[in-house]
Amino acid sequence: MDYEEVRHYVNQYGRLRDVQFSAYELYARKHNLTAKELFVLDILWFSPEGCLQSEICERLSATKQTISAIIKKFLKKGYVTLTESETDRRNKIVRFTEAGAEYVGRIIPPAAGAEIEAMGELSGEDIAELVRLTAAFSEAMRKKFRQIG
C-alpha cells in the first residue's frame, strides 16, 4: 500500500478513535467528571483491593501530578482513601470509601455494561480480530513513537 493510501486509513482510524473517546468524554461530563477522572474511577472499580497510584499513572500514561490532583479531588469528596504501600512508602494505595463505592457504583457499571453490549454486537470472530489488530497497531505505534523521541 502506498503512503497516501495508508495516510487515508490513518485519518479514518483517527476519526473512529475520536468517536470512541467522545462517547467517554460525554458520559463523563454527564457526571461532572473529565474523561481522565472517569478512567481513574474505572481502574479503581475493577481493583477491589485498591490500586497503587503509580499503576494508575502507568495505565493511563499520565503524570504523577495529574493523577495526584484527581485523587486529591476524590479524597476531598470522601470517595477514596490513601494508604502507604508496604513495599514502597512513597507510593500510595488508593481505595474507595463506602461513599465512594456507592457513588462510583452508579457510574462505572453502566459504562462497563455499555462497552460490553457494544462489543457484543460484533461476532466472536470480529471481536477477536478487533482485539488482535488493535494490539498489533498499538504495539507498532508505541515502537514508532519511542523511535522519534
Describe every region a protein language model picked out.
Residues 13, 41-44, 134:
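Hydrophobic structural patches
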Residues 1, 125-149:
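C-terminal regulatory/oligomerization modules of transcriptional regulators
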Residues 13-23, 60, 103, 107-119, ...:
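Alpha-helical linker/hinge and terminal dimerization helices associated
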Residues 21, 72-132:
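Charged, amphipathic alpha-helical coiled-coil/dimerization segments
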Residues 22-66:
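N-terminal helix-turn-helix DNA-binding core of bacterial DNA-binding proteins
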Residues 1-31, 79:
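N-terminal leader segment of winged-helix/HTH proteins
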